[in-house]
UniProtKB/Swiss-Prot annotation:
Listed GO biological process terms: defense response to virus
CDD domains: STING_bact-like
Transmembrane regions: 14-34, 45-65
Entry protein name: CD-NTase-associated protein 13
Subunit composition and interactions: Homodimer.
Matches recorded under InterPro entries: Prok_STING
Role this protein plays: Effector protein of a CBASS antivirus system. CBASS (cyclic oligonucleotide-based antiphage signaling system) provides immunity against bacteriophage. The CD-NTase protein synthesizes cyclic nucleotides in response to infection; these serve as specific second messenger signals. The signals activate a diverse range of effectors, leading to bacterial cell death and thus abortive phage infection. A type I-D(GG) CBASS system.
GO cellular component terms, A-Z: plasma membrane
Membrane-protein topology: Multi-pass membrane protein
Amino acid sequence: MEKIYTWLKTNSYIVHHVSTSLNIISFIIVLIWIFESTIKEKLNIIFTVNLEAIVVFISILIVGLNQLLQKLLIEAEYSPAFALAVGYFKNFIFPAITQIKENGEVNPKICIYKPKHFDELTSTNIDMIKAELTNKKYNLSEINLSLKGARARDILTLNKKSKIHSYFDFPNTLLSLYSYVDFKIASSNNNSSELKKKKFVELLIEQFYLKLNELIQENNLTNNITFCDKNLQGL
């Protein structure tokens, strides 16, 4: 089933054409059904099938295909966010958790920052978040993790009483969606581009974290990873 769904994602136009064809067929059958008695009388045609049942069956198919098409279109719209989430998890989060455990920590905690907008990931805002963490009596330091199968990465540690309380990361990979957002909004005819851009950014970020959370659950890491916003809820 997964292979079929993957194929449909790259050929969604087929679903669209089939749905359109079924709509046309359904419309024709409805007309025949409405004028069934006239057709029988004028053309002396005897219908051996239940036209009403056929219309109902085709209608169910159309609803199912339209729902599938809607899902495919949504996935196509947000596919860059999904791809980034997969890359971020496989190339950093999962190897980082693995390496930290191999270094001797039994139950490491990583808190991933969840912004509402890309601007929250600028260096100025990151410095502000770090200041807030310091005000919460955390001692901040950065360590370099040598990850197996991935490049080494720096990660922020939040320390209390000379012990590592948890790790903290800003997913700067989200900033690579800037150009995608600009492209999508520029290709739109909607005049309220700034408002639309803001909403689209929020949706992309939300989809990124939904996919990331899905991967976290699939790999049984819900006890190791949390999300927190600018109010630092979740630490």
